[in-house]
Structures are given as structure tokens and as C-alpha cells.
């Protein structure tokens, strides 16, 4: 991938975005028919009701095979529908919609993951693996992350094929395993072992970005331009232990919890980069009152000044803003002890960090040692494959891709036709996505889901995950028009 500085990225982004801002009134976009919607809903339901968790009950292969059957039944050539992977239970599906004839244009890849995080029936008001429509929402594990986009893109590929669409370049859809965790049977494996199947001019990854709503008001359309680095750390306290009837003054559990209290009270330093600065500049124009004033203050005041610090503190009360300002680290799992009547000899916590670009996992590991301030604690790095090591990698961030007009012009035009007047702005993704593997392989990746969600209704990975029905229909219309725009003809 061509490396560019953030200012160059934003300058280049300004051209297509400004062109769209002054364009004439949008003409009506083609929309999905009732039959198209019915098929898309059926596919969505089917995917939600196939458990694709990384558990003994889950199977990504079952979901991939179900979609493979749909493509083959629709008439896609078998040589263009690939079910493959190193793990029999975690097979990926790669489908190629071929160009009408010889072409010099490289393909476009739409990258989606099929796996979802575990959900317990006891935690939900509905069965997480049953597709439930209620009060204008679809409920089920994966309705936000990210089977809605899986289903929308599968149905769009099928619709275009049914309509006899003839693109000028190949369009590729990859439905992958192990994005939510595992041992790299998914996107990383495809890039390393089958580059020929997924090689592309650029990638659209719907696992990031989307439309932010505030009580029904359209605020901004986010397009991922970079992302934080995901890192896990194992914090361990040890002790000789003993009989619980004779407590010791030192205690592994107490020492670990005291250290975690320090972490809970700590805020990593406030930071902005050019992507987040542009994001808050655009957002300040949409916000009102104190929120807008605080955004303008953090942009104008020198970092660390009283004005900037006070504004950042107020904005940080909103988790989505806070995570755009700094590295975040939070305890996510605890384990301790071996018997109810014995003092714990070991207490461990997993601390999950999302690292602001410009900092490495090893730098944060060393910072955690200082924050916890207890030489008796061990702070180790946990790799994505679960390997625990004393030191961490030095990977600092996903390199932002060079902006491509053929991506941003149709993306902006179609988005603003569906959500009139919404500003389209580059953002930093606070989660982690499979885009990193393609970025490291030199393939530009952009994150955009075309899903509209209320800021306070982000339920991905959480209880009662749900998606507004209308948001799903709009994503169908977006992908249909976007695929035709980037595919040509």
C-alpha cells in the first residue's frame, strides 16, 4: 500500500467530499422490491439462526456452506464459489462475481466476517440464536456485528446476478472465520495462503463505520481511515497460599484487585491525530450546546491547557468520544484460587487495551507496569493465538490507505441520497477488524457499514443485540447502488 501522511489523506479526501456537497439535488436511487426485501430478510434470519460462535456448539462452516448453496443454486459457477480453510469447523466462503469480459481493472473485495461472539440465553430477553422481529427491530446475536452486512451483501450479489448485471471488473465477497478471536483461520489465512482469491484494488469492510444517529437525527457518516491496535495483557499475582483459616497479610486476590482499582482510576493521556481532529471538526458543526463548545475547545486550545483538559473531561463521559481521545485499557476477565478453603496461590486478570495509533503494545505493557505500581505483579502480553510472552510486539497502527476517488465519490453520493445532508468523514475505528491483514499486505481498506444506529444503542457483543428494521432496508439499497457504481456498467 502507498503510504501517505494524514494531512495528505485528508486533503485528498476533501475533493470528492466537497464535490458531493455542492452537487445538484440527488436523483432517486433504485430500491429493493418487496421480493428483494423478502429474500434479504430470509437470508438474515438464516444466518442469525446458525450459531457461528467459537464454541463446541458453533460452526462458521455451517453458515458458509448455507450461503455457498444459495450461490450455487442461483447459478454462480462452482469455480467461483470457494469453501475453504485449515479448520473443518471454520471454513471461509469466497465468491467471485466475474466481469463481463477481459478487464485490466483489479477486483473490489467486500470483506465480512461470519463468526460472532458467544451469547448466553440466560442473559437475554429473547433467544440470541433465534431471529426475532419486535417493535421495529430485529433481535439476535450478530444483528449489529455483523451478519446484517453479511446478509445484505449476499442478497445484493444474488439480486445483481438474477438481474443479469455485467460488471466491468470482478467483485469479490469474502465471508470469513475468526475475526472475533481464534487462530487465524479467516482473513489472515486467506491473505497468506490464497492471495489469488482475495487480491483486490481495494477493500470495503462493513465491520466498521456507519451512520451515527442522535435521537433520530442523522449526525455523521463515519468511514474508517485507521484503527486502534488490539492488545491483551495477563496480570498475575502470586502467593505461597495456605489454609483459609489462617489468612496472611499478603493475599494474591487483594493485591490483584488493588492493582485493578488503580487501572480503573487511570486515564491514558488525551491525544488527537489528523483523522480524529477532522472527525471532531465535522462533528462540532452538527452538535449543539456544551458538546459543540467542548469539541471546538479541544480543537483550538493547546493540548494539556486547562480549557482543553476541562472540555476533554466532559466529553470523555461519553464512551464513544472517550475512546477517540486516548488509549483505553479495561479488565475483562478474572480467575483466582483453586479451592474454597485455601488461600489463592495465583490470581489473574485479562486486561484488554485498544491502543491509540503511534503507540506499540510493548509501550503500553511498560505503562501498565507503572500504573499498577506493584513489583510483585507480572504483566505479560497475550497474542491473538493465546500465547503468553514477557514482551509485546512493536506494531504501532494500521497505515491509513490513500484515498481513492472511485471509493469516496459513490460512497458519499449514495449515502447522502439515503440520508440527505449527512457529512461523510474519516474516522479512527476503536475496535479491531480484519482490515489490518490486508493493509499489511498492501491492499487499501476502508470501513463502512451503511448501518444507521443510535449512539446509545450500540449492542454489539452485548445483551439483546438488535438492529432497526429500516436500517437494514437502507443498507440493502446502499450496497446495491454502490456495487453497481464501483463495478461499472
Question: Where on the chain are the PLM-derived regions?
Answer:
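Bacterial N-terminal signal peptides
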Residues: 7-20
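Metal-dependent amide/peptide-bond hydrolase catalytic core
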Residues: 26-28, 208-219, 223-474, 480, ...
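Acidic/His- and Gly-rich active-site-bordering loop/insert found
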Residues: 26-141, 160-169, 351
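Solvent-exposed, acidic/flexible segments
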Residues: 33-41, 53-64, 88, 143-146, ...
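Stable alpha-helical elements in mature extracytoplasmic
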Residues: 36-44, 63, 67, 149, ...
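Sec-exported extracytoplasmic/periplasmic mature domains
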Residues: 45-53, 68-77, 155-162, 192-199, ...
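Solvent-exposed loop/turn segments at secondary-structure junctions
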Residues: 52-55, 88, 100-101, 114-118, ...
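Acidic/histidine-rich catalytic neighborhood of metal-dependent amide-processing enzymes
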Residues: 137-138, 144-222
